[in-house]
């Protein structure tokens, strides 16, 4: 039989083993679609970002007007910018659902895959943050000022660290220039880490909704899951395009239509919606260093999840108590997101503190406890 180039060519066989002949569990649900959706989000963001970078000027006097120029005078510039800005929102929606799937179905027990995923999340958050500063509107400027200022909470070297990050004594031209450089670089770093993430995943193969070995029943990725991924893609792109074309500024802040002014502070400084949960946790602690540590812990806690798994079953499919706790956590995160968008006053302060406390309690205390309890129930 003639050799199949798909299976023998050094480059094509890597693609073949990852996307065509990959043995995949026969029962993975739509919750397993988000990996491919994230890959498409990344490609979309890199392409639209590249086109935007061709028309952008990373200078404090020109940044705001260069973005306005892109939207007004560049062919389809408005479309490229709206796709890029709202693409970030969909990127985060997909990554949150992807992480939620991992939590629910115990995918975190593939430790290397999970840890590289957490690194990807952190890199994505960094990329989104530096990107938000680039249009140099009011919220861009003040968001950059507030968040970079948090480094000053580091004992002894804090102030030096902040001035080093700023490239001066305030957020100014050097800050914008380096943020643009980082925003251009990081998506390619994300693409690199994604390949590592997939390499680790393909070492073990995919998990499945039952949490049991699927070695006895695997099917090829193509055509079964390639077509399923394309369906998922159309289902994601429909609301994405609806948002980007019909209400592109829905998720943005009106303050960002005003050019950055260091002399005027906006009444409410808040980040984009996808950072609000962490922002609420940061604000719920009335101490700078404590807040910064809580902020870091709110994401880094994901690294502890594999060690807090006490159940004899991998997934939550047959664990109603853990399921209840999981959805409680989801509701808790929605409350934190809402609190992050509210002013710092009664009753929002106490609600935020309660929600922050319950966030850490659910993950660190209640999940292991309920897992152990369910093991005991199994014996009766």
Swiss-Prot record:
Keywords, ordered alphabetically:
Electron transport, Heme, Iron, Membrane, Metal-binding, Mitochondrion, Mitochondrion inner membrane, Respiratory chain, Transmembrane, Transmembrane helix, Transport, Ubiquinone
Q: Where do the annotations place heme b b566 binding?
A: 98, 197
Protein's cellular compartments: Mitochondrion inner membrane
Q: Name one GO molecular function term.
A: ubiquinol-cytochrome-c reductase activity
Subunit structure as annotated in this protein's UniProt entry: The cytochrome bc1 complex contains 11 subunits: 3 respiratory subunits (MT-CYB, CYC1 and UQCRFS1), 2 core proteins (UQCRC1 and UQCRC2) and 6 low-molecular weight proteins (UQCRH/QCR6, UQCRB/QCR7, UQCRQ/QCR8, UQCR10/QCR9, UQCR11/QCR10 and a cleavage product of UQCRFS1). This cytochrome bc1 complex then forms a dimer.
The UniProt similarity line reads: Belongs to the cytochrome b family.
Q: Which PANTHER family match?
A: CYTOCHROME B
Q: What is this protein called?
A: Cytochrome b
């Amino acid at each position: 039989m003639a050799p199949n180039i798909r299976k023998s060519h050094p480059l094509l066989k890597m693609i073949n083993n990852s996307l065509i002949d990959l043995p995949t569990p026969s029962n993975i649900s739509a919750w397993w679609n988000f990996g491919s959706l994230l890959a498409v989000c990344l490609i979309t963001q890199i392409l639209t970002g590249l086109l935007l970078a061709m028309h952008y000027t990373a200078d404090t006097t020109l940044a705001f007007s260069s973005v306005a120029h892109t939207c007004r005078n560049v062919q389809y510039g408005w479309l490229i910018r709206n796709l890029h800005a709202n693409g970030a929102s969909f990127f985060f929606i997909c990554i949150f659902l992807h992480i939620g799937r991992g939590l629910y179905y115990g995918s975190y027990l593939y430790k290397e895959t999970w840890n590289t995923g957490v690194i990807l999340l952190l890199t994505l958050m960094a990329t989104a943050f530096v990107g938000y500063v680039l249009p140099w509107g009011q919220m861009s400027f003040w968001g950059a000022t507030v968040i970079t200022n948090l480094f000053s909470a580091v004992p002894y070297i804090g102030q030096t660290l902040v001035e080093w990050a700023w490239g001066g004594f305030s957020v100014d031209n050097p800050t914008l220039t380096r943020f643009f450089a980082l925003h251009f670089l990081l998506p390619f770093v994300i693409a690199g880490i994604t390949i590592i993430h997939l390499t680790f995943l393909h070492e073990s193969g995919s998990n499945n909704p039952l949490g049991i070995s699927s070695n006895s029943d695997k099917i090829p990725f193509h055509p079964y899951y390639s077509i399923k991924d394309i369906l998922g893609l159309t289902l994601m792109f429909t609301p994405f395009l609806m948002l980007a074309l019909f209400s592109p500024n829905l998720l943005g802040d009106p303050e960002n239509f005003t050019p950055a002014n260091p002399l005027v502070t906006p009444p409410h400084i808040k980040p984009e919606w996808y950072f609000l949960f962490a922002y609420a946790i940061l604000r719920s602690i009335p101490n700078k260093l404590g807040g910064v540590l809580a902020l870091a812990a709110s994401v880094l806690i994901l690294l502890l999840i594999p060690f807090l798994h006490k159940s004899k079953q991998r997934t939550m499919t047959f664990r109603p108590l853990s399921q209840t706790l999981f959805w409680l956590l989801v509701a808790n995160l929605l409350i934190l997101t809402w609190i992050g968008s509210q002013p710092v006053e009664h009753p929002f302060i106490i609600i935020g503190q309660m929600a922050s406390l319950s966030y850490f309690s659910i993950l660190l205390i209640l999940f292991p406890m309920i897992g152990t309890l369910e093991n005991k129930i199994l014996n009766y």
